[in-house]
Swiss-Prot record:
It comes from Caenorhabditis elegans. This is Uncharacterized protein F59B2.9. The lineage of its organism: Eukaryota, Metazoa, Ecdysozoa, Nematoda, Chromadorea. InterPro entries: F-box-assoc_dom_typ2 (IPR012885), F-box_dom (IPR001810). PROSITE patterns: FBOX. Residues 2-53 form the F-box domain. It comes from the Eukaryota.
Amino acid sequence: MSFNLLDLPIVPRQKALKYLEPIDLFELSLCSKRMAQSVRDLKIEASAHFITLTRGQSSVHVQFKERSRAIWWDFKEIFMKKDLKDKRKIGYILFENCEKFRRGAFTLDEFYCHFDNLEEGAAAVSKHFQFLFPGPLNILLSPTVYRHLEFLFFEPSIQKCESFEMCGADIPAKRTMNRIFDKLTIEKKLCIRPKTSENYVIKQALRVEELFLRSARWMTREHLLELNCIVADLSDHNFQCSDFEAFAEKWMNNKSSKVENLRFQWQSDVEFKLENLKTSRWDSTRRERNYIFTMKNESVQIDCSDGFELERNDGRLATFVVEQQEDRTHILYFLVWIELFPEKKRLENLPKTLGPLYKQLEKINRDYPDESSLERLLSNPNLVYTEFLETYKVLKNMDGENRSPSTGQAFRRTIFDKIYNTIDL
């Protein structure tokens, strides 16, 4: 006996739908606009939407906050067109050659599809995903590979994204850049990996939270003074020492500045000097030696002991730090000290951070009571951190002689590694 799911009252209908995986909800949503709205009414949020159009990949996918299985729609021609026999209509587009695959081991659900206009197809699929499962959009694009960007950015749901990354080796034409930046609003992160024309100004680059430019020669002093990114990494620019002084002076007079971590890289034989800016040397009573931040999920430390210190009238400190490489490459950091003693704070929080790991060790030692004396020592949450680091190095050296660790030893090593990496920045 069959029945129409939409004939159910709204509460039991929503309860029934919530038992389904996102890919099944997506399939149901293609039945009618009413069913699509019913799926949207479940309020299943996406952690992120992605559009990837590069030389090696052309896909749309969505990841979820509370669901483990992502949905992928892949336009890459992995299978023969004649073997993709399903049809699906999304919006006004009929995809005549597609096929669904479910991969339990990889916790993802995937559609493979042949479609000639990839930009138009990606826009249609992403628009529907975003309607069903609201969440931020991230775009990765090789603009010199895909020639019909007007079909992608014509769609309003694609005209605003959380992050935009441009990749590729060729310099994009001005017309191509206009097709992107005349339509697209970027809310948080902009990364442009290829070189770009010195004559093309990307105004919204100055206002995103995170900015990464391989080529910043289009930026003038006026653009530098407008820069209000939390994090920026600019290579190959035309700035002089006097421009950096002007930037620092503006920061000194601007308490609302969002700037925290700026990195400038260029090649020159000119020594970095601050001629007119009043600076001081490092005072260990006012801040720590190292500036600590996270990059690509890894902790990074910059030694600021030889930096040029600035103090704003509200007490906020900033430091210019210069690193010079052997190949004439200069790296200049402008670092704002939001936390004056980050390592001290990190060490104070370590017991709380490491607590769950030591709890896991307790359970492992109960289930596998074959720990050695060194392993028992390392399992002690009250062990001094420096002693843990030294003891674990000794244990790792001894492991070379034991090529067949027991199950308990293998489990303990995994936790010890995590503790070691957490303690030792």
